[in-house]
Design a protein with these regions (language model features):
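Membrane-water interface of transmembrane alpha-helices
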Residues: 63-80, 189
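Polytopic alpha-helical membrane-helix bundles and their juxtamembrane interface segments
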Residues: 1-29, 47, 78-80, 88-212
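Transmembrane helix boundary and interhelical junction motifs in multipass membrane proteins
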Residues: 34, 38, 146-149
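Early transmembrane hairpin module of multi-pass membrane proteins
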Residues: 18-23, 31, 37-71
């Protein structure tokens, strides 16, 4: 018997919202369990976005799942001595390359969606998709910059997109994500300062800045 996603949608969105909030709240605390819960959440959002016609966002959830497994491993073993990964900041070169990549990828993905799908918001969908991937990559590396990218590049634009698509609960979720991301930004910056006060600078990976 075929499974009708439209029948399950009233249950999928609340479940995705709850697990999504749990994921970000645990990420703020740098809890490793945030990754498996996040994988479950992204799988639920994948189903939800397919039904809503947000195709780039659907692909994004699949990438999130792959990055989730990578982030899970990297947080455990990506530290300077193969141990827990510390919070750091990206180098200036990394920031410039990411910014250029975001612009080029947004134009390419937006054009692709405009030509090949029935998406009514191809370029906004593409921009939030590319920025989401960027933020998630930064998160897997425990770069502090992941939080402002989530807030200004992803969550704020998504509020408008999801309201336009009739996903009110998911739009409201972005407000919760923004509040949690601000908390994460503050907490991770504090974690960096505490680490620098305790450990020698030699313990910081080469090419990585440490903010006070």
């Amino acid at each position: 018997m075929d499974l009708d996603i439209t029948v399950l949608q009233p249950f999928i969105e609340p479940a995705a919202v709850v697990t999504g909030i749990a994921t970000v709240a645990l990420t703020v605390r740098q809890a490793i369990v945030s990754w498996p819960i996040g994988i479950v959440s992204t799988a639920l959002f994948l189903l939800l976005f397919l039904e809503a016609g947000l195709y780039a966002d659907s692909v994004l959830q699949g990438l999130y799942i792959l990055l989730g497994f990578y982030g899970w491993w990297h947080w455990l073993h990506g530290g300077p001595r193969g141990n827990d990964l510390p919070v750091t900041t990206a180098s200036p070169r990394t920031r410039v390359l990411l910014a250029l990549g975001v612009v080029l990828a947004t134009l390419a993905v937006g054009r692709f969606l405009d030509v090949t799908t029935d998406s009514t918001v191809p370029y906004p969908d593409a921009a939030t998709t590319v920025l989401s991937i960027t933020a998630q990559i930064l998160l897997t590396r425990k770069y502090l910059e992941s939080w402002p990218v989530w807030i200004f590049g992803v969550n704020l634009p998504y509020i408008a997109i999801y309201l336009y698509k009739g996903l009110a609960m998911t739009a409201a979720l972005q407000l919760v994500f923004i509040a949690l991301s601000i908390a994460g930004w503050v907490a991770w910056r504090r974690s960096m300062a505490e680490r620098r006060a305790v450990l020698p600078s030699a313990d910081t990976p080469a090419g990585v800045e440490v903010a006070a």
